[in-house]
Design a protein with these regions (language model features):
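Alpha-helical transmembrane segments
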Residues: 2-25
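Membrane-interface junction motifs in transport/secretion proteins
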Residues: 18-41
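Extracytoplasmic/periplasmic
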Residues: 12, 38-58
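Mid-to-C-terminal secondary-structure elements
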Residues: 49-198
Length: 198
């Protein structure tokens, strides 16, 4: 019993002292409706607007999944537009759908570029064709992190412009390696996250 207690204590200390690459303090996650209905995007927008008006809410965002739970999906067939290498289309990327406030709410820092513009997220990723990637994805695409990646294009059936590169963070757990991730802007969501004032 004593050995198990000491081991658990050390694991908790490690987790508390380790850098996740994001800030989870004072965050509250609200799961939205699991069934999509007509006009759901408008309802989501109204709910987010109501959240932002509450005095105890410092920041808020919406996403189709949340850190610790998972990604939206994984896919292959995405390559750098200029000079793709043989086999690049077989590399897998995790896809995560979120709004423009996700990175600020979770304290995820940008290495380059910026988040989505509000009207870009409202028009949805498949119409705007702008993406944000993490450092791991940038490296897997073959980009040099010391060079400017903003404005570069990737191909996923159609060309998508990279508008931001976020620093890597532990999206799932410490045990799992950080996955190459592409972030897509949208306003169709299943989760709302608020940072509350303590």
């Amino acid at each position: 019993f004593i050995i198990a207690t000491i081991t658990l204590y050390k694991q908790l200390q490690y987790m508390q002292n380790s850098n996740l690459g994001m800030n989870l303090n004072q965050l509250l996650v609200i799961q939205g409706p699991t069934v999509s209905s007509e006009g759901q995007a408008e309802k989501n927008f109204a709910f987010k607007n109501t959240l932002s008006q509450l005095a105890f809410v410092k920041k808020q965002c919406a996403s189709n999944n949340v850190p610790g739970v998972g990604y939206n999906f994984s896919t292959e067939g995405i390559t750098k537009m200029n000079n793709p290498q043989k086999g690049d289309d077989k590399k897998s990327y995790s896809m995560f759908i979120c709004d423009q406030n996700f990175f600020d709410t979770y304290g995820i820092n940008f290495a380059q570029g910026k988040t989505f513009e509000p009207n870009d997220a409202e028009r949805s990723w498949n119409n705007v064709r702008k993406v944000i990637i993490n450092e791991k994805a940038a490296q897997q695409f073959g980009f040099d992190l010391k060079q400017n990646i903003i404005g570069q294009k990737i191909t996923w059936g159609e060309p998508f412009e990279i508008i931001g590169v976020v620093k890597d963070y532990h999206h799932l757990s410490f045990r799992e390696q950080i996955k190459p991730t592409i972030y897509l802007g949208s306003v169709s969501f299943g989760y709302f996250t608020v940072q509350v004032d303590s």
